[in-house]
């Protein structure tokens, strides 16, 4: 079993131009499969609101939701760097709130770090959490918790003025003490500049090549059917496999073809003894 990565390992990988591959996971089996496949990191994202809980966005997701799913992922991937995603409302109010909730992630869910969205507007939060001894990953570009302010789930940094803000935000996140940065739905030219400019690792989700790549597991596995982002490559169609399996099961149950003799437990005493037993209750 591979040794869990450390922040020092991730920094060394950036310097060596070695890519980091990671995915989201929200449950024990997916986390276990991801670890077996050699993923260096797993994000328990607030995207669980959409891909697991059926919400229209990430806003309704609670701390309890995130912690519960982080606990399941940690049990499934004990040797993988696990990132707890701070949900909407867990860090927006104050630095004290942010630290308190980040501590909950570390103590209750046994994550290795937390992630929060935003640049300049959350610099005091990042600083406060890191001052408390908790590693922080930043997140800029398309930030789902702020999608309403961004005009929906749209790519960011496609114009010079917006790209300038993203670059400034990236520098602020690093200066505030974050150990890494996730950039989402940003043109690769901008992402590359940020990755080259920053000393900390810069990871991409739909933002082109940099120090590593993140994808939503439900998207890459073809499980989430509401929509598929442009940047997703489907490596499987699990939804089709599961649906067909369910259909076959329904058909066999209706036709009396399941269960067969192979799928039942057989009695250990004689049939006659059981017949006597049944007679007692008639």
From Swiss-Prot:
The lineage of its organism: Bacteria, Bacillati, Bacillota, Clostridia, Peptostreptococcales. SUPFAM superfamilies: Phosphoenolpyruvate/pyruvate domain. Its cofactor is Mg(2+). This is 3-methyl-2-oxobutanoate hydroxymethyltransferase. Belongs to the PanB family. Its EC number is 2.1.2.11. Keywords: Cytoplasm, Magnesium, Metal-binding, Pantothenate biosynthesis, Transferase. Mg(2+) binds at residues 46, 85, 117. It is an enzyme of class 2 (transferase). Signal peptide: none annotated. GO terms for molecular function: 3-methyl-2-oxobutanoate hydroxymethyltransferase activity; magnesium ion binding. Pathway: Cofactor biosynthesis; (R)-pantothenate biosynthesis; (R)-pantoate from 3-methyl-2-oxobutanoate: step 1/2. Homodecamer; pentamer of dimers. It is found in: Cytoplasm. One of its GO terms (cellular component) is cytoplasm. The active site is at 184 (proton acceptor). Binds 1 Mg(2+) ion per subunit. 3-methyl-2-oxobutanoate binds at residues 46-47, 85, 115. Transmembrane segments: none annotated. GO terms for biological process: pantothenate biosynthetic process. Catalyzes the reversible reaction in which hydroxymethyl group from 5,10-methylenetetrahydrofolate is transferred onto alpha-ketoisovalerate to form ketopantoate.
């Amino acid at each position: 079993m591979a040794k869990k990565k450390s922040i020092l390992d991730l920094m060394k990988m950036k310097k060596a131009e070695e890519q980091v591959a990671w995915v989201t996971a929200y449950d024990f089996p997916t986390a276990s499969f991801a670890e077996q496949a050699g993923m260096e990191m797993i994000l328990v994202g607030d995207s669980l609101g959409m891909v697991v809980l059926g919400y229209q966005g990430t806003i309704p997701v609670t701390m309890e939701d995130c912690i519960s799913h982080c606990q399941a992922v940690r049990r499934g991937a004990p040797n993988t760097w696990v990132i707890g995603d701070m949900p909407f409302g867990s860090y927006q109010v104050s630095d004290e709130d942010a630290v308190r909730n980040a501590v909950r992630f570390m103590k209750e869910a046994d994550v290795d770090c937390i992630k929060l969205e935003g640049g300049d507007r959350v610099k005091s939060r990042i600083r406060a959490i890191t001052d408390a001894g908790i590693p922080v990953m930043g997140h800029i570009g398309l930030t789902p918790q702020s999608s309403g302010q961004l005009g929906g789930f749209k790519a960011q940094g496609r114009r010079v003025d917006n790209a300038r803000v993203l670059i400034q935000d990236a520098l602020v996140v690093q200066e505030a003490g974050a150990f890494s940065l996730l950039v989402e739905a940003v043109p690769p030219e901008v992402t590359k500049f940020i990755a080259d400019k920053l000393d900390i690792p810069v990871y991409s989700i739909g933002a082109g090549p940099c120090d590593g790549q993140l994808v939503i597991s439900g998207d890459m596995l073809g499980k989430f059917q509401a929509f598929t982002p442009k940047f997703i490559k489907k490596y499987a169609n699990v939804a089709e496999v599961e649906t067909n399996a369910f259909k076959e099961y329904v058909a066999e149950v209706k036709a009396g073809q399941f269960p067969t003799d192979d799928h039942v437990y057989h009695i250990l005493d004689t049939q006659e003894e059981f017949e006597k037993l049944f007679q007692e209750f008639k």
